[in-house]
Amino acid sequence: MANELELKYGCNPNQKPARIFMKDGELPIEVLNGRPGYINLLDAFNSWQLVKELKEATKLPAAASFKHVSPAGAAVAVEMNDTLKKIYFVDDVKLSPLATAYARARGADRMSSYGDFIALSDTCDEETARLINREVSDGVIAPDYTPEALEILKNKRKGTYNVIKIDPAYRPDSIEHKDVFGITFEQGRNELKIDESLLKEMPTQNQVIPADAKRDLIIALITLKYTQSNSVCYAKDGQAIGIGAGQQSRIHCTRLAGNKADIWYLRQHPKVMNLPWIEKIRRADRDNTIDIYISEDYDDVLADGIWQQFFTEKPEVLTREEKRAWLNTMTGVSLGSDAFFPFGDNIERAHKSGVSYIAQPGGSVRDDHVISTCDKYNMVMAFTGIRLFHH
């Protein structure tokens, strides 16, 4: 391993020269294939920290899908039911635990994950590599690769696919630096350990959090730790199902993440699962068509002369009433927020997406209103006392 890696350019093609380097010692990575770019590496290093912490917290293999320095998906290896396998388009393959985590992370928000960078907590096996090979992505970072997996990945994207191996034992300095406008910022790294001890203070009337919900709250909080702020994360069944990143308004975060969670659940509606696709439709076209079909712009794919491009017969509209009725059956969702909720409107929006459990710092002057809104819906809310801003 070297102490410097020259890059083609920085964030944009005009930003030259570009490199990553270590002032002391060697880089903890080895590029096994491809030529990763500046943003690829930002995604790689942020996503690696996320999956490493997920694995440590849950003791399960973990995976993340990153785009523009925020996760589109994050998950651990919780076995999937047949419905999830079908909507993630992995019902035709054998899934190892790591492949299961990857399928969940990639499948949560397929529109946002298109062209992502992948992080894996464990050695990439053949089953995971075969799944990665089917999707459009920029690269992957993992602690190692089996020979079979590496061979598959090296042949992806005409041999240019980015494959990075990272030393899992690497620990950065406790002080980190960042230059902005020629001025150096220095701070202690956010080494806060996220575990169930953060969920002990519950100001709500309902204070019962099942084990799987505690796991999901931990997943949401760790995901937020590496998401551009402001951020909110909905989680269920061992994975993030909706991430709202980089919004200036807290309620906009909650709405954005909630809308993504709604889409995740609506994809499980029988009308969506039984859409009559034409043969050999491209994966990207199928994902985009589902996204439009679920939305209020469904005519864009159902109008005469257009639906024939995607379907063997014209599907029925998924009506607003049908969507609301289906969403009303979604329950047991966990939600994390990287900062406090200033008003109860966030809770009202979360309730519409089946949220039953919440973890947020607390500390708003309107905490009483937020708590009473949770009590109205019999939600459990934990005050973690920690803020998780990330920039």
Predicted regions mapped to residue ranges:
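Active-site loops and adjacent core secondary-structure elements that bind or stabilize anionic groups
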Residues: M1-L198, A213-S231
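Conserved helix-loop functional segments at active or binding sites
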Residues: E53, Y226, I263-R267, K352, ...
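Flexible, glycine/charged-enriched surface loops at secondary-structure junctions
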Residues: A57-S65, V163-I166, S229-K236, L266-W277, ...
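Active-site-proximal loop/turn and secondary-structure-junction residues that shape catalytic pockets
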Residues: S70, C124, K236-Q239, F341, ...
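Glycine- and Gly-Pro-enriched alpha-helical subdomains that act as flexible
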Residues: A72-R110, I241-F340
